[in-house]
From Swiss-Prot:
Subcellular localization, as worded in the UniProt entry: Cytoplasm
EC identifiers of the protein: 6.1.1.17
Similarity section: Belongs to the class-I aminoacyl-tRNA synthetase family. Glutamate--tRNA ligase type 1 subfamily.
Species assigned in the record: Afipia carboxidovorans (strain ATCC 49405 / DSM 1227 / KCTC 32145 / OM5) (Oligotropha carboxidovorans)
Name of the protein in its database record: Glutamate--tRNA ligase
Amino acid sequence: MTEPVVTRFAPSPTGFLHIGGARTALFNWLYARKQGGKMLLRIEDTDRERSTDAAIKAILDGLNWLGIEWDGEVIYQFSRAARHREVAEQLLAEGKAYRCYATPEELTKMREAARAEGRAVRYDGRWRDRDPSEAPADVKPVIRLKAPQTGETVIEDQVQGRVVWQNENLDDLVLLRSDGTPTYMLAVVVDDHDMGVTHVIRGDDHLINAARQKHIYDALGWTVPTMAHIPLIHGPDGSKLSKRHGALGVEAYRTMGYLPAALRNYLVRLGWSHGDQEIFSTSEMIEAFELSGIGRSAARFDFAKLENLNGHYMRASGDAELVKAFEDILQFLPQGPALQAKLNDTTRAQLLQAMPGLKERAKTLLELIDSAAYIFADRPLALDAKASAVLTPQVRALLGELRSSLANVTDWNAANTEAAMRAYAEKNNLKLGAVAQPLRAALTGRTTSPGIFDVLAVLGRDDALARLQDQAA
């Protein structure tokens, strides 16, 4: 019987959950769900100077917002330091590791000499076979692994294929620092083993770590997990992802008005494919996800593609669902408190009524909020420059007449207000646009808006007529 699949997402809490980390978490989660296994969450907080509680909160919030659920309690790596030291001492006792008394000055000279000679920088093993009796009394040692010095180290990677390193190019890595704290390399191996991790899915910037970590696994006689090193995400031009390209924290995408389902769908297609399918529900992702579908080349981040995909999800979302999303995002926006204060039973009902038209036009929640601004506008409306230019004295006189025509509409809805407008335009030999544009400017303060008949219906008779009165001559 095969053992159950256990994956892990193991971020360092030194910053927000960036977009590459979010994709790594998603791939781990999808693979675990596809295989009926578990995804664990381990916070690698051994760098005590750079790890922050704010970053931990941002990581947990980001995963929750994206709908990526981990199994069990969050594991904090630093809390396991005693276990890591125990393993280092075990290797020392078994003769598979040794105390190294090289001073920082010696190591600096070693590095400088290697660079001057054009050699790779690596520890030269000077304390590997020396008698401990030669140890200087005033130097606290580190503990180093006795790595193999000949032959090769091979990783059969599920994405990169067979990757081979010559052992002569890999040095004796530090397991325990001179202050007794474990290194990242040791902590990761011990934690993955103790947590029963069967598959390590992470960025290919960790590929060299895989070779070095395999040396630790082999020294301990532990099974090496299946490895899958996924390509990094690049900008649209193929360069390293920068903030202008999209190298932002997940919380920034939330604030920019993207829906979690859309971002999840976009991320799964960054470097993974399943035929030519672009749109995936969560259940479809889980059903289709295989490590073999991950490509070896870097994926390119494309904001326009994300925006279009988000637009698709906006249009496919239920109206009430979008009203909730509208409210949820306000806490993250500068104008949020002012809008929140205006949300009441009336404006919520208007927003829900307007939503079919709003979501057809908006690609993000920010665009949706902007298009819905007329619902929350205070009278008399502030007009933008284009709307002011439309409302000439002659047009303002027209608005007064148009208001009188609309005031005769008893059953106030989009169809009846449209009929009244068309009748007015026909009676006065005007094109519909010559009536609709001034109406739009007076009702919304802008020259672009959702369908003007929908605007009339959403505002209701009293508010619409009052806004027209405000602008009429």
